[in-house]
């Protein structure tokens, strides 16, 4: 499974034009979240652009669409790790805790159980930014999403390590 996943990632990355002119600083990226057949080429372009500017990213805060989560508040997966065909990736528990304590999201790992919008991004992060951590957040469509984004912007601004948001 590992080799097939790496081969597929490389295939998508090879389709990305090299050294595109980019904005001064990429702080965030928008990525599609369909299966790789439909969305990986664009996701590869986004992650490649981030890599072009930032050789190392400490943490990716990943916002995911809520397809089967019907809670009112954004749900943070705030403990442990996720597993993909490329192995484990660690949740940045410290940053996740700060986000939950902001009052704009709740701790709810179960909300992520039947969602796919975040997990399709994680292998790109593992492959291109080995050692990076994640903070996965399922975000229902509500005004609270805007408030959450503002709070996370403030929180990230106080971090001393490189954090990039993906959604």
Predicted regions and their residues:
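Active-site histidine-anchored catalytic micro-motif
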Residues: 1-167
């Amino acid at each position: 499974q590992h080799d097939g996943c790496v081969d597929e990632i490389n295939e998508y990355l090879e389709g990305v034009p090299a050294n595109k002119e980019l904005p001064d600083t990429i702080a965030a990226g928008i990525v599609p979240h369909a299966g790789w057949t439909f969305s990986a080429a664009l996701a590869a372009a986004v992650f490649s652009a981030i890599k072009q500017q930032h050789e190392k990213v400490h943490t990716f805060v990943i916002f995911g669409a809520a397809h089967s989560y019907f809670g009112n508040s954004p749900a943070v997966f705030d403990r442990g790790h996720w597993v993909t065909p490329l192995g484990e990736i660690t949740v940045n528990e410290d940053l996740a805790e700060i986000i939950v304590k902001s009052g704009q999201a709740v701790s709810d790992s179960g909300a992520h159980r039947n969602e796919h919008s975040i997990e399709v991004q994680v292998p790109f992060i593992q492959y291109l930014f080995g050692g990076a951590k994640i903070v996965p957040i399922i975000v229902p469509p509500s005004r609270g999403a805007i408030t959450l984004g503002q709070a996370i912007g403030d929180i990230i601004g106080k971090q001393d390590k490189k954090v990039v948001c993906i959604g």
